[in-house]
Swiss-Prot record:
Signal peptide: none annotated. Residues 16-28 have a biased composition (Polar residues). InterPro entries: PRONE_dom, RopGEF. Residues 1-28 are annotated as: Disordered. Coiled coil: none annotated. The keyword rRNA processing does not apply. Guanine-nucleotide exchange factor (GEF) that acts as an activator of Rop (Rho of plants) GTPases by promoting the exchange of GDP for GTP. It holds the Pfam family PRONE. This is Rop guanine nucleotide exchange factor 3. It comes from Arabidopsis thaliana.
Length: 473
């Protein structure tokens, strides 16, 4: 088993929104981990697979057929508990089949000891919180398994087993993040009582099965690239401008890729290009994978929006929103007429994604600055009364209006650049997040988003080379 603690793994992802395999320095120590280099700076449901670390017990049928004298249901052995022995036998059979080697076992012990100690192997109690530790572990596992996977081909059997086994272990934490909901229980004597039963927390109950399904679909997508009509040149055997086919002929190959990405493998196609069937299949796979990418990105954005804003971020906000966005943008936003964010973005002439991220940071900071000033200007103290700022009478407050316009501008900016990397606030939320469930969902959705984006980029490379070859005929 490869060690998860590998900050030098390469990703192939051209958008900083997702994990970038194109940058050799992508997997580095996140700013929110003060104890370990095995982490990553970035910028998204009930488990279908029963974890080997926890046995899920259904308590809905855990009552006897007869009521007690006090009419309280008497707990007896449930149906699911009767199945535990069978599940344990199946689990033991799986263990026998897998036969984890001694080095792998020692690596897992070390890794989970690291999780327990918060990445502080000295045991001095100075480690990061559990949420950050698990987030880093999932990110590092992704880098270990997919870091060197830079082409459209099935994942190696060993890496697939590593990914599935360790993700099941990391996701098993969610089995214990539950909430209680009321449920009516019908007794044998006809009486109905209301009992409380546990189920996974709402966000986990909804999102985790969806993420597992997306994970499975991405694995199937990679498995489908067998016996393809395209292939890859050996790394270092050709430049970005020429390639040599298996027949010994030379032809010009131009890939849609920055010149500094020289270490990435170059896709090759036959001299006449791909067949119509192969080209159609590639386009269909690209479309389906792109939908997976959008779904993972939506889940990630949703989880991030639910995370609490750290106090450390609020303390760094400027006292004036105007100083954050700049004079020209502020002048346009503070106009008395109707605000058109799309026109403002057109006037800014954003030429790169880096500029877009900087603008998003500034607009987001100004938005929270104006919101804070709007709340402070209100004399009401309780939160329920502060929410009355939504009333019509208070919509005339200048700070409130500016905060609304900043939010609209930020929304339009993210719509125009859907693969925009995470803002400073998002990174700060991940850094100071202490909710283990949200940390699992955020990191899991983020790595799936990165993998989906990479697959789409690799397919685009093949289609571009195919188009170039057909155009040169």
């Amino acid at each position: 088993m490869e060690n998860l603690s590998n900050p030098d793994e390469n990703d192939d992802h051209q958008s900083p929104r997702s994990i970038d395999q194109n940058d050799q320095s992508a997997v580095e120590t996140p700013v929110y981990s003060t104890m370990s280099i095995d982490s990553f700076v970035y910028p998204r449901t009930c488990s279908e697979t029963t974890s080997g670390f926890s046995d899920q017990i259904d308590e809905t049928n855990s009552f006897c057929s007869e009521a007690s004298p006090c009419n309280w249901p008497v707990l007896t052995e449930s149906k699911s508990s009767k199945c535990l022995s069978g599940l344990e036998m199946q689990s033991n059979e799986c263990l026998v089949v897998q036969e984890i080697s001694e080095p792998e076992l020692e690596t897992m012990k070390e890794r989970f000891a690291k999780l327990l100690l918060g990445e502080d192997m000295s045991g001095s109690g100075k480690g990061v919180c559990t949420a950050v530790t698990i987030s880093n572990a999932i990110t590092n596992l992704y880098a270990t398994v997919f870091g060197q996977n830079l082409r459209l081909e099935p994942l190696e059997t060993e890496k697939r087993a590593l990914w599935k086994r360790e993700m099941n272990c990391l996701l098993s934490v969610c089995d214990y993040i539950v909430e209680f909901i009321p449920r009516c229980q019908n007794l044998s004597n006809g009486a109905t009582v209301e009992v409380m039963e546990s189920r996974p927390r709402a966000d986990i109950y909804i999102n985790l099965p969806a993420l597992r399904k997306l994970d499975s679909m991405l694995m199937e997508a990679l498995d489908s690239f067998q016996n393809t009509e395209f292939w890859y040149a050996e790394e270092g055997s050709l430049s970005m401008k020429s390639a040599r086919s298996s027949t010994g002929s030379f032809r010009k190959v131009i890939v849609q890729r920055k010149e500094e990405k020289w270490w990435l493998p170059v896709p090759l196609v036959p001299s006449e290009g791909l067949s119509d069937k192969a080209r159609k299949q590639l386009k269909n796979k690209r479309e389906s994978t792109n939908q997976i990418h959008k779904a993972a990105m939506a889940i990630n954005s949703s989880i991030l929006s639910e995370m609490e804003i750290p106090d450390s971020y609020m303390t760094t906000l400027p006292k004036c929103g105007k100083s954050s966005v700049g004079d020209s943008i502020y002048r346009y936003m503070s106009g008395s007429g109707r605000f058109f964010p799309e026109q403002l973005l057109d006037c800014l002439n954003i030429s790169s994604e880096h500029e877009a991220v900087q603008l998003a940071d500034r607009v987001e900071a100004s938005m929270y600055t104006w919101r804070r000033k709007s709340c402070l200007s209100n004399s009401k103290n309780s939160w329920n009364m502060v929410k009355d700022l939504m009333s019509t009478t208070e919509r005339t407050d200048k700070n409130y209006v500016m905060a609304e316009r900043a939010e609209t501008l930020l929304f339009c900016l993210k719509q125009r650049y859907p693969e925009l990397s995470q803002t400073s606030l998002d990174i700060c939320k991940i850094q100071y997040n202490k909710d283990v469930g949200k940390a699992v969902l955020e990191s899991y959705s983020r790595v799936l988003e990165g993998l989906a984006f990479n697959i789409v980029a690799w397919i685009d490379d093949v289609l571009y080379v195919d188009k170039t070859m057909r155009g040169s005929e």
